[in-house]
Each structure stands twice: as C-alpha cells, then as structure tokens.
C-alpha cells in the first residue's frame, strides 16, 4: 500500500514556502558558521597581539637592561678616567710646585736649606762608613756639587759626589761600607706637606 501526501491549497505557493523555509535555515546556519569563524579569527588575533605585545615588552626590558648595563659600565670607565686625569693633574701641579720651590724661597735661602740637609745627612752617614757618596737630584746637581765638599770639609770627612738621580730636588747619601742609603730628596722630606697640598689640590679639582 502506497502512502501519499495530500497538498491542501495552491501547490506552487506551498513550494515557495518550502524553499523560503529551507533558505532561511541555510542562511541561519551560514550566519552561525561565519560568526564562529569570526570569533576564531578574533581570538587568534587577540592571542597573536598579546603574544606580540609580550615579546615587545620582553625585548624592551632587555634593551633597557643592556642600556643600563652599558651606561653603568661607561660611568665606571668615565669615573676611572676622570680619577686618572685628576691624579695626573695633581702630580703635575705638585711637580711644578717643587720645581719652582727655589723661586718661592729665593736661591740663597734654598741653598741654605740644602746645606742644612747635607750637614745632617753627612753626619749620620759618616758614623756608619768611611766612604760616603752623595747623589744629587738632577735639578740640584750644581748646588749639591758645590755645597757637599764644603760641608764635608767643615766636618773633617771625605765625600764623593756621584751621578745624579731622578727627583724634584735634594739628594741621596750612600754610606757604602754600611750598605745604607739616606733619601733627602724633596718629595721624601717634604712628604707630609706635599700630602696636605695634594689633598687641597684634589679638593679644588673636585669642585
């Protein structure tokens, strides 16, 4: 027995309604699919954007850390260089001051100062050795060569004037037999005053 569907009314209108219903259903499904696809795309975009932002922040942090490290390193290098420059400037200033000491006090007063140093040095050295050698600092070579024999004669001792040594002024005395060397160069005997002067110069340079 064959079943049949009876269509009531206009068959063509029924067909239109059926097609319209199917079309609406299909359109609805398409809209749902498109909406789902849009959400997937948006989520992917948001995740990508978030990841990109995270990467950018990380890169920025690394760059800032590198800049800070470089800046700190450069600052240390600059401070070290500045300290070296200041130290060099101090030594140059002190060297000039020592070299000009004769001008400050006058030649005769300076020679009297060297003579007193020779008197003390030769007195000490001659007690230790019969052979005493005086080595003048280069700037005072002529003064020491002139005064040493005179001071030695006054004390009744013999003295040799040896080769010049480096120094801002003054001399060294060697008691040969005792293996003893006495240092009477200006930078040694004036050390306390020079340290005070160095501190003052550094204070001025740091202002």
UniProtKB/Swiss-Prot annotation:
User: Is the tRNA-binding keyword given for this protein?
Assistant: no
- Compartments where found: Cell membrane
One annotated Gene Ontology cellular component of this protein: plasma membrane
**Annotated keywords:** ATP synthesis, Cell membrane, Hydrogen ion transport, Ion transport, Membrane, Transport
TM helices/strands, residue ranges: none
The primary location reported for this protein is membrane
Q: Which family does it belong to?
A: Belongs to the V-ATPase E subunit family.
Report quaternary structure and partners. Answer: Has multiple subunits with at least A(3), B(3), C, D, E, F, H, I and proteolipid K(x).
Q: Which HAMAP family match?
A: ATP_synth_E_arch
Q: What is the name of the protein in this document?
A: A-type ATP synthase subunit E
- Organism, per UniProt? Hyperthermus butylicus (strain DSM 5456 / JCM 9403 / PLM1-5)
């Amino acid at each position: 027995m064959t079943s049949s569907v009876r269509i009531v009314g206009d068959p063509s209108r029924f067909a239109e309604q059926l097609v319209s219903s199917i079309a609406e259903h299909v359109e609805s499904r398409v809209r749902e699919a498109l909406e789902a696809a849009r959400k997937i795309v948006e989520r992917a975009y948001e995740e990508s954007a978030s990841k990109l932002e995270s990467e950018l922040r990380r890169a920025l942090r690394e760059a800032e850390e590198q800049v800070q490290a470089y800046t700190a390193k450069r600052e240390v290098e600059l401070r070290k260089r500045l300290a070296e420059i200041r130290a060099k400037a101090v030594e140059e200033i002190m060297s000039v001051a020592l070299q000009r000491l004769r001008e400050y006090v006058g030649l005769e007063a300076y020679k009297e100062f060297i003579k007193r140093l020779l008197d003390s040095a030769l007195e000490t050295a001659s007690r230790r050795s019969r052979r005493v050698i005086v080595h003048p600092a280069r700037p005072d070579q002529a003064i020491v060569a002139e005064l040493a024999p005179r001071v030695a004669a006054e004390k009744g001792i013999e003295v040799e004037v040896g080769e010049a040594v480096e120094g801002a002024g003054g001399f060294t005395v060697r008691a040969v037999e005792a293996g003893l060397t006495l240092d009477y160069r200006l930078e040694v005997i004036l050390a306390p005053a020079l340290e005070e002067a160095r501190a003052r110069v550094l204070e001025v340079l740091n202002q």
